[in-house]
Amino acid sequence: MWSIFEARPKEAHSVNKIGWLRASVLGANDGILSLSGLLVGVVAANADIKVILITGVAGLMSGALSMAVGEYVSVSSQADLEDADLQLERREMDADWDAEVDELAAIYRGRGLDEELSRTVAVQLMEYNALEAHARDELGINIHTTAKPTLAALSSAASFSVGGIFPLLTSLITPLEYLSLVLPIATMFFLGMLGFVGAHIGGAKRVRAILRAVVLGLLAMAATALVGRLLEIHALSLQYAI
């Protein structure tokens, strides 16, 4: 039986991949859908290839920067909140150590330990690392996985760019007269592959992940194509009115 202070052998659980897998899939999915939706809308408005490519490059750059800034702000805010909670916990332990022991013991009693054992565990954990014990069991914070806003921002921008480059390249190599048909089909393929890769890495059901990505992506592109078509009709009506 392992002691609570001994290192356990690591087990390969899929849940351990949730953080980085979610961020990577989310960024790449946003890149594919944002660029595809934007390009489909422009194509539906009968824009020429120059306008389509300029729109695609601008969308890729603005989307990547937006993802980076949003992720940086989000992770920084989370880090600030966690740090404030840890500082408060330090002050509470300095002010009344015994009360913090009782608080930790009460948490363990709520998880099924008896009175004596819960207090023994609380005392030993606080003697070993009081802040870590309270951060983990009271606040739900792992002090060993500190937030890295810059890394998170760069990763988010990179994953968005990787996803967005595929529909942009599709627009580059496809003749304009076929683009309205090829781009949605290619996007469905890209989304399906992304769903498959995410499900494979995470150990989830692949068919469900693929269908979810493809169906939702198709709905998003249909909406943007409709908007583009309506804008073209409106522009033509204004032109004839003038």
Swiss-Prot record:
It is a multi-pass membrane protein. InterPro entries: Ccc1_fam. It catalyses: Fe(2+)(in) = Fe(2+)(out). Residues 46-48, 174-180, 234-242 are vacuolar. It comes from the Eukaryota. One of its GO terms (biological process) is manganese ion transmembrane transport. The chain crosses the membrane at residues 25-45, 49-69, 153-173, 181-201, 213-233. It is found in: Endoplasmic reticulum; Golgi apparatus membrane; Vacuole membrane. GO terms for molecular function: ferrous iron transmembrane transporter activity; iron ion transmembrane transporter activity; manganese ion transmembrane transporter activity. Residues 1-24, 70-152, 202-212 are cytoplasmic. The modification Phosphoserine is found at S3. Keywords: Endoplasmic reticulum, Golgi apparatus, Membrane, Phosphoprotein, Transmembrane, Transmembrane helix, Transport, Vacuole. GO terms for cellular component: endoplasmic reticulum; fungal-type vacuole membrane; Golgi membrane; membrane. Induction: Transcriptionally repressed by CCAAT complex in response to low iron supply conditions. Has a role in both calcium and manganese homeostasis. Involved in the transfer of iron and Mn(2+) from the cytosol to the vacuole for storage of these metals. PANTHER family: FE(2+)/MN(2+) TRANSPORTER PCL1. Belongs to the CCC1 family. This is Fe(2+)/Mn(2+) transporter pcl1. The gene is pcl1.
